[in-house]
Every structure is written in C-alpha cells, then in structure tokens.
Curated annotation (Swiss-Prot):
SUPFAM superfamilies: HydA/Nqo6-like
Gene for this chain: nuoB
InterPro entries documented for this protein: NADH_UbQ_OxRdtase-like_20kDa, NADH_UQ_OxRdtase_20Kd_su
Details of cofactor binding: Binds 1 [4Fe-4S] cluster.
Protein name: NADH-quinone oxidoreductase subunit B
Lineage: Bacteria, Pseudomonadati, Pseudomonadota, Alphaproteobacteria, Rickettsiales
Species of origin: Orientia tsutsugamushi (strain Boryong) (Rickettsia tsutsugamushi)
Length: 171
C-alpha cells in the first residue's frame, strides 16, 4: 500500500511539473542575480554630494526598487558610496569602515571631490581621490552628480557584478 501511495504522489507531482514548467540555471547565475538585486549600501557622506545621495533614496527616485536598502553598520553592507570631499584626517576612518565590510564588497565614488579632489584638489588637507585609500569599482562624475547619475552608476555596478565570477569552487 505504501508503494502505491508513493507512485501516485510521484505521478501527480510529475504532471504538475510538466504543466507549469521549470527554470534551468546554474549556481553562478543564481548568485549573480541575487547579489545584483540586494545591494546594501553603507553611506559615507562627506559633503554636498551626500544630499544628492539622500535624494536618490527618496520617493522620486526610490533606490529600493533596485533592492538597495541603506544599512547603518559596515558589517551589514556590501557597497560603500563615498560622496564628497575626503580629507586626510578622514582617510583612516574610511579605510577602517571599508575593512569592516563583509566580502564581497564594492565601492562607488560619487562626485568630483571623491573622484579626484574636485574644487579642493590643490588643498593640502584633501586626498586627491578616494581610490588612493580604497579600491573603487564605479566612478560617478559631477559636482554634485544628479540622482540620475548615481542610479546609472548603480546600474553599471550591477552589470559589473554580473560579469564577475561569484562562486569559487575548490578542486
């Protein structure tokens, strides 16, 4: 009786599966899809670019539709958005926050000041680009960059994540 019940259940399952279809994907595509649609940024707002970053998270542009949810702790974040002028005094704090982030981690440099010093490039107290402190994946130009530019940078980061290998297999 138990064999008969098992075969009936299996045949019903197979009929339902053939009627609905199924999805074929490898683990690499699944992990890339999940990571690109659940980016959690850590805000590192240093100047006026941070205002534009906040506007991007508002209701008009709604970063949440891309799966982005700002996290208050670097241990919960996988993307750091450096927005604004990075001074020499703030550089060790930036590196410390970056080191506390979990792997894999990505950095978006937002604005002319974060990209290369911007208006304050020749000042003695300004780091001429946050890429001297942390590795940067995406540069968003502008002074200040518009929310659309930041969203475009986020979309470029998603494309970059899809292109890179996410799963490392041990042999």
């Amino acid at each position: 009786m138990s064999e008969n019940t098992f075969s009936d259940t299996t045949s019903i399952y197979n009929q339902n599966l053939s009627n609905q279809g199924f999805i074929l994907a490898n683990l690499e595509n699944l992990v890339s899809w999940a990571r690109t649609r659940s980016l959690w940024p850590m805000t590192f707002g240093l100047a006026c670019c941070a205002i534009e970053m906040m506007q991007t998270a508002g209701s008009r542009y709604d970063m949440d539709r891309y799966g982005m949810l700002f996290r208050p702790s670097p241990r919960q974040a996988d993307v750091m958005i450096v927005a604004g002028t990075l001074t020499n005094k703030m550089a060790p704090a930036l590196r410390r926050v970056y080191d506390q982030m979990t792997e894999p981690k990505w950095v978006i440099s937002m604005g002319s000041c974060a990209n290369g010093g911007g208006y304050y490039h020749y000042s003695y107290s300004v780091v001429r680009g946050c890429d001297k402190i942390v590795p940067v994946d995406i540069y968003v130009p502008g002074c200040p960059p518009t929310p659309e530019a930041l969203l475009y940078g986020i979309l470029q980061l998603q494309k970059k994540i899809n292109r890179t290998q996410q799963v490392k297999f041990k042999r």
